[in-house]
UniProtKB/Swiss-Prot annotation:
Gene Ontology terms, MF aspect: hormone activity; type 1 melanocortin receptor binding; type 3 melanocortin receptor binding; type 4 melanocortin receptor binding
Post-translational modification: Specific enzymatic cleavages at paired basic residues yield the different active peptides.
Protein name as annotated: Pro-opiomelanocortin
GO CC annotations on file: extracellular space; secretory granule
Organism for this UniProt entry: Ovis aries (Sheep)
């Protein structure tokens, strides 16, 4: 009877061990050692036969398990499934995934740890070789200054010297004189008359401007600056003389009505 209880307890222990494992292979229970579980020796033999399978499914390091070497390189672990992963792509659902992010990180580390002189005379990295970022696409990126104008190169040396010696206005006058000389005396007379008219117009405008400055300011460029008197206030504030024909008309109508009633 005690042997039967011990065998039952052993079988129960074996069943619990088999259920605790992640996956149990079929050959362990179908082996000849696990067919007869009535005796304690057969039970222990079955447990020993199934123990390697259990340890392969759920590996446990007895004792100093923390000191055992890791199967995976911890540097390969990158949180590529998070959007703030700095080594992975922005889209976590990309074809590479976390593996591509880890590979990218390893490449960056390999580039940083590659052979090359270091110290005070170290070579500048690829990031240091890049030009400093200047916000040229913004209007406030660079200080506002005078725009560079293209330098005009003349084929003749005389024209270049004249451009440096005379300012733009004198240069225009010189070109105008050359054209007049090429046209003839009639064109010169016409241009002289046009110049005289232009000068007269400029003098007249200057005198008119002086008169305006001396007098009171009037908003003549607006339509309400100085309206005529008969159109002020919508034509209601007019003189009494303009209303006399209307008054006489009303008087005549009233007199006619009175005569008709009296008859």
């Amino acid at each position: 009877m005690p042997r039967l209880c011990s065998s039952r307890s052993g079988a129960l222990l074996l069943v619990l061990l088999l259920q605790a494992s992640m996956e149990v292979r079929g050959w362990c229970l179908e082996s000849s050692q696990c067919q007869d579980l009535t005796t304690e020796s057969n039970l222990l033999a079955c447990i020993r036969a199934c123990k390697p399978d259990l340890s392969a499914e759920t590996p446990v390091f007895p004792g100093n398990g923390d000191e055992q070497p890791l199967t995976e390189n911890p540097r390969k672990y990158v949180m590529g499934h998070f959007r703030w992963d700095r080594f992975g792509r922005r889209n976590g659902s990309s074809s590479f995934g976390a593996g591509g992010a880890a590979q990218k990180r390893e490449e960056e580390v390999a580039v940083g740890e590659g052979p090359g002189p270091r110290g005070d005379g170290a070579e500048t990295g690829p990031r240091e070789d890049k030009r400093s970022y200047s916000m040229e696409h913004f209007r406030w990126g660079k200080p506002v200054g005078k725009k560079r104008r293209p330098v005009k190169v003349y084929p003749n040396g005389a024209e270049d010297e004249s451009a440096q010696a005379f300012p733009l206005e004198f240069k225009r006058e010189l070109t105008g004189e050359r054209l007049e000389q090429a046209r003839g005396p009639e064109a010169q007379a016409e241009s002289a008359a046009a110049r005289a008219e232009l000068e007269y117009g400029l003098v007249a405008e200057a005198e008119a401007a002086e008169k305006k400055d001396s007098g009171p300011y009037k908003m003549e460029h607006f339509r309400w600056g100085s309206p005529p008197k008969d159109k002020r206030y919508g034509g209601f504030m007019t003189s009494e003389k303009s209303q006399t024909p209307l008054v006489t008309l009303f008087k005549n109508a009233i007199i006619k009505n009175a005569h008709k009633k009296g008859q």
